[in-house]
Amino acid sequence: MTATLRPYLNAVRATLQAALCLENFSSQVVERHNKPEVEVRSSKELLLQPVVISRNEKEKVLIEGSINSVRVSIAVKQADEIEKILCHKFMRFMMMRAENFFILRRKPVEGYDISFLITNFHTEQMYKHKLVDFVIHFMEEIDKEISEMKLSVNARARIVAEEFLKNF
């Protein structure tokens, strides 16, 4: 793991642990409704200040909290065109299977690659520290996966180019 990744992930972990102090909060507008306030944005007093944790200009995390929900949006490192394409395809693959990941949003926040929505119901049903561990582990693994896919694509392209050039 690189020297800058560990402090970045530690900052995200600490911020998520602080933001996951959620409680049940019924809607102030409709009786017997309970919607994530971070999504609905019905009243300003229920929203916390959004926090952006940035490793560099392209790799950052936006944590938006409210009284009953937290939205975590992640921008993954995309150094070149191959990484952009791989990241887009991988995120699309993940979001198509959002129903299998209870906290994954189908559509990311504008300017980010993937978003998670954690509500008070998730923190009641699952351990908070396990939710935080999942997000951190996801951030570690996504970087590794995209790097491995890039190496695989480059190796495959090299083999194809060699085979093509054998004919000349």
Swiss-Prot record:
Positions of transmembrane segments: none
Record bears the keyword Cytoplasm: yes
Pfam families listed in its UniProt record: ARPC4
Gene Ontology cellular component list: Arp2/3 protein complex; cell projection; cytoplasm; nucleus; site of double-strand break
SUPFAM superfamilies per record: Arp2/3 complex subunits
Compartments (UniProt record): Cytoplasm, Cytoskeleton; Cell projection; Nucleus
Biological process according to GO: actin filament polymerization; Arp2/3 complex-mediated actin nucleation
Keyword annotations from UniProtKB, A to Z: Actin-binding, Cell projection, Cytoplasm, Cytoskeleton, Nucleus
A molecular function (GO) term: actin filament binding
Main location: cytoplasm
Subunit structure: Component of the Arp2/3 complex composed of actr2/arp2, actr3/arp3, arpc1 (arpc1a or arpc1b), arpc2, arpc3, arpc4 and arpc5.
Purpose: Actin-binding component of the Arp2/3 complex, a multiprotein complex that mediates actin polymerization upon stimulation by nucleation-promoting factor (NPF). The Arp2/3 complex mediates the formation of branched actin networks in the cytoplasm, providing the force for cell motility. In addition to its role in the cytoplasmic cytoskeleton, the Arp2/3 complex also promotes actin polymerization in the nucleus, thereby regulating gene transcription and repair of damaged DNA.
Family recorded in the similarity comment: Belongs to the ARPC4 family.
This protein's name: Actin-related protein 2/3 complex subunit 4
Source organism: Xenopus laevis (African clawed frog)
